[in-house]
């Protein structure tokens, strides 16, 4: 009488064994697919690395071609009074960094120069050149950025040699016209805060990025206030569109 029960147990055991074997086959196939996928991703990574190297080669080539053009541009800019002061003040972000005292100093700013390292991926420098002025001894204020393979950025900046009585303590200037002077941060803290500093991977110097990637390529558009004018045109177009929609609604 126990035979049917034994057969049932055997059938269940066989079924469990079959399911386990099937699961092993599925797991094996999944592992194999993932391994093949990883191989393809590794291959893509190599292609991407090659592409990055090629892009850097092209960028290096054209950086060298652009250099003499930038120098010619700089010569012309120096014939235009207050060019860089006007360009900075017209920039929506950089203008916020210039105090009234900074603006007086910027009237002596002759040139701004952004120069990539010979190997463009290893860093760049930003140099502000000033004419003789009553504020500091330096002819040039330079900030350099060196990119390491581990992703860190090392920053060095000119230690400003202020003339007697002209130093802005800690890079801060006091606002005038207030019983209790308000302290506003000077643009020149950009130099004093990072005379020797390292930034971790992914951390950027926002001011340097704006100067290098936005202002430097075409400062003329800010000198001419083109950026502001474009924004005004967009606002006007938006207003015209809104008025058109209102007219259509009234007609309906």
From Swiss-Prot:
GO biological process, alphabetically ordered: double-strand break repair via homologous recombination; nucleosome assembly
Predominant place of localization: nucleus
Disulfide-bonded cysteines: none
InterPro entries for the chain: NAP-like_sf, NAP_family
Compartments where found: Nucleus; Cytoplasm
Coiled-coil regions listed: 26-67
Bias type Acidic residues, positions: 226-252
Biased composition (Basic and acidic residues): 1-15
Family: Belongs to the nucleosome assembly protein (NAP) family.
Function text: Acts as a histone H2A/H2B chaperone in nucleosome assembly.
Entry's free-text remark on domains: The acidic domain is probably involved in the interaction with histones.
Designated name of the protein: NAP1-related protein 2
Source species of the chain: Oryza sativa subsp. indica (Rice)
């Amino acid at each position: 009488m126990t035979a049917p029960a034994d057969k049932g147990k055997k059938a269940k055991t066989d079924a469990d064994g079959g399911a386990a074997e099937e699961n092993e086959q599925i797991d094996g196939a999944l592992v194999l697919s993932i391994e093949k996928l990883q191989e393809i991703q590794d291959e893509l990574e190599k292609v991407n690395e090659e592409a990055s190297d090629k892009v850097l080669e092209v960028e290096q080539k054209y950086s060298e071609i652009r250099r003499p053009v930038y120098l010619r541009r700089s010569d012309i800019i120096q014939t235009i009074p207050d060019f860089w002061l006007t360009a900075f003040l017209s920039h929506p972000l950089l203008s916020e960094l210039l105090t009234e005292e900074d603006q007086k100093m910027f009237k002596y700013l002759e040139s701004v120069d952004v120069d990539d390292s010979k190997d463009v991926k290893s860093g760049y420098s930003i140099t502000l050149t000033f004419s003789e002025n009553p504020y500091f001894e330096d002819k040039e204020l330079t900030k350099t950025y060196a990119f390491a393979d581990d992703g860190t950025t090392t920053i060095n900046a000119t230690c400003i040699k202020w003339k007697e009585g002209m130093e802005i303590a800690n890079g801060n200037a006091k606002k005038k016209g207030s019983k209790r002077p308000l302290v506003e941060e000077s643009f020149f803290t950009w130099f004093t805060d990072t005379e020797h500093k390292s930034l971790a991977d992914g951390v950027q110097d926002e001011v340097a990025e704006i100067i290098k990637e936005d202002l430097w390529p075409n400062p003329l558009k800010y000198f001419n206030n083109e950026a502001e004018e474009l924004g005004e045109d967009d606002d006007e177009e938006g207003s015209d569109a809104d008025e058109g929609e209102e007219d259509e609604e009234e007609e309906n």
